[in-house]
Amino acid sequence: MHDPVDTYMNLVPMVVEQTSRGERAYDIFSRLLKERIVFVNGPVHDGMSQLVVAQLLHLEAENPSKEISMYINSPGGVVTSGLSIYDTMQYIKPKVSTLVVGQAASMGSLLLTAGEKGMRFSLPNSRIMVHQPSGGYQGQATDIMIHAQETQKLKDRLNQIYVKHTGQPLKKVVDALERDNFMDAEQAKEWGLIDEIVESRANEDTSK
């Protein structure tokens, strides 16, 4: 029996556009991609990250000087998958504006704060959460030690990324990420994860 939630999530709305050659149908995400809007929606994993990276590279090739808007609603996920999106955001020429819609937790919060300085936004009721990467590898003692060392390296790297984009001192970042740390939009702004809280497009436009 199909889960009705899964069925709903797999239903992607279609939009019809009138062109000189007649009507053309797009799925809603492809239509928004034409407007240079990229969605980071749901858990961050390899499949999702490769789609986001491909969209960013496509938009850069299309126009390297025009801003890209990234909408984020994510509980986080695989660290390396999130870092592939992060690195691409820093690598491409277009400025990337970020906006959290709903939640930006774990790697979602890192992608949110990685947007262009002054162009990182939150809707008023969004939630943001930061924490350290989790381990949990099982196996031989030596392998467990190797994976523990790798987790520590990732933790140190993520700390440095948050320091870079928030302007917070390293000790404050380390302390904040020690446990799940939930913030509302105002707290995220005070912490430097975002630049502005927007309630309407008019507010967003005046913030730029």
UniProtKB/Swiss-Prot annotation:
Gene Ontology MF: a single term: ATPase binding
EC number(s) recorded for this UniProt protein: 3.4.21.92
Transmembrane in keyword set: no
GO cellular component terms attached to this protein's record: cytoplasm; endopeptidase Clp complex
Reactions it catalyzes: Hydrolysis of proteins to small peptides in the presence of ATP and magnesium. alpha-casein is the usual test substrate. In the absence of ATP, only oligopeptides shorter than five residues are hydrolyzed (such as succinyl-Leu-Tyr-|-NHMec, and Leu-Tyr-Leu-|-Tyr-Trp, in which cleavage of the -Tyr-|-Leu- and -Tyr-|-Trp bonds also occurs)
Catalytic residues, chain numbering: 106 (nucleophile), 131
One family name in Pfam for this protein: CLP_protease
Subunit record text: Fourteen ClpP subunits assemble into 2 heptameric rings which stack back to back to give a disk-like structure with a central cavity, resembling the structure of eukaryotic proteasomes.
Function as written in the Swiss-Prot or TrEMBL entry: Cleaves peptides in various proteins in a process that requires ATP hydrolysis. Has a chymotrypsin-like activity. Plays a major role in the degradation of misfolded proteins.
Membership in a protein family: Belongs to the peptidase S14 family.
HAMAP family for the chain: ClpP
NCBIfam families cross-referenced by the UniProt entry: PRK00277.1, PRK12553.1
Protein name: ATP-dependent Clp protease proteolytic subunit
Organism, scientific name: Dinoroseobacter shibae (strain DSM 16493 / NCIMB 14021 / DFL 12)
Gene: clpP
